[in-house]
Amino acid sequence: MNKIDFVVTWVDGGDPIWQAKKAKYSGAVDTSKNSMNSVKAYRDWGTFKYWFRGVEKFAPWVNKVYLVTDQQKPSWLDINSEKLVLVDHTEIICNDYLPVFSANPIESNIHRIPGLSEHFVFFNDDMYLTAPVEPTDFFSEDGLPKYNTALSPIIPERYGTGNFQVNDMEIVTSYFSRNEILKNGQFFDPKQGLKSIVKSLLYRNSQFICGFWESHLPYPLLRSTMNLVWEKEKAVLERTSASRFRNPSDTNVWLFKYWQIASGKYAIGNPKLGGLFSLDNAGPDFWKILNSGKYQIMCINDGFNIQDEEQVMTDFIKAMDQLLPDRSSFEI
């Protein structure tokens, strides 16, 4: 197995300098509670250090950890940590497009990180390692990224990711026919798991490929694939890169994952590797799950309808500290 790097993006939405910069450009952008550019999209729960603790405890084999930020760093971060590389937006995004306040342009350019390995795993900062993982959880022995997927319709939810997924799939289906995708996608392989196979069976006779199911877990990616898609769809990806705030015309990082699936250049992952959770549902039972070791990876999404945010934040930090009490080498 070749070297595997981790890439994670982070923003401190409470930073006054960053807030002033954002306010300068936000203008007519919808930043209401449920919008795609709401405060929730930038909120920091104070749990990011546990992301690093999880990496050190549960994935000590990782080569480098690239932290991508906009001229920011957590106050507790040891920038001299051996495995850490800080990456500023100016290193990967054209200066003409900066500053950006959307994940889409940032994530679409992570392959430009200087020194990044061919094999890397991209994390959002709400995707935590909660039990040991191995390189083979993310890549096959011959270096293919591992995914668990299914045919699944794109959900047209207001303020959701449906627009981005449609744009991603529009590109993918312009290069791969329906029959090629059905052949290459391995949707009916038993290793996908019963739930995924049932989903795919429901939609296999559709005239068109309706979309791929998204697990919301870290994304194993190949730098060469991102370069290839950029070569083929530079104009589209440049438009996304120039999108200062989330825009319905954007593509997102799933495009590169979908390309791997449609081309058949992927291996099937463990369908029980992790799960998606929301802080809307946080309570005693959830905190027990967090510390149970049942899931190796947990994506813990911020919520739109958290009843008592202060209490949830306190409980969240307490539960993470119970799971990962020891300071990591990434901390001062």
UniProtKB/Swiss-Prot annotation:
The residue stretches assigned to a coiled coil in this entry are none
Keyword Transferase: yes or no? Answer: yes
Question: Pfam families given for it?
Answer: Stealth_CR1 (PF17101), Stealth_CR2 (PF11380), Stealth_CR3 (PF17102)
Q: Which UniProt keywords apply?
A: Exopolysaccharide synthesis, Transferase
EC code: 2.7.-.-
Q: This protein's superkingdom?
A: Bacteria
GO MF term (any one): transferase activity, transferring phosphorus-containing groups
Q: Which GO terms describe its biological process?
A: polysaccharide biosynthetic process
Q: Which enzyme class, named as a word?
A: transferase
Q: Which family does it belong to?
A: Belongs to the stealth family.
Also noted in the record is: Stealth proteins are part of a protein family that is conserved from bacteria to higher eukaryotes. Family members were first identified in microbes as proteins that help pathogens to elude the host innate immune system. Microbial stealth proteins are involved in the biosynthesis of exopolysaccharides. Stealth proteins are predicted to function as hexose-1-phosphoryltransferases.
Indicate what this protein is called per its UniProt record: Receptor polysaccharide phosphotransferase WefC
What taxonomic lineage is listed for the species of origin? Bacteria, Bacillati, Bacillota, Bacilli, Lactobacillales
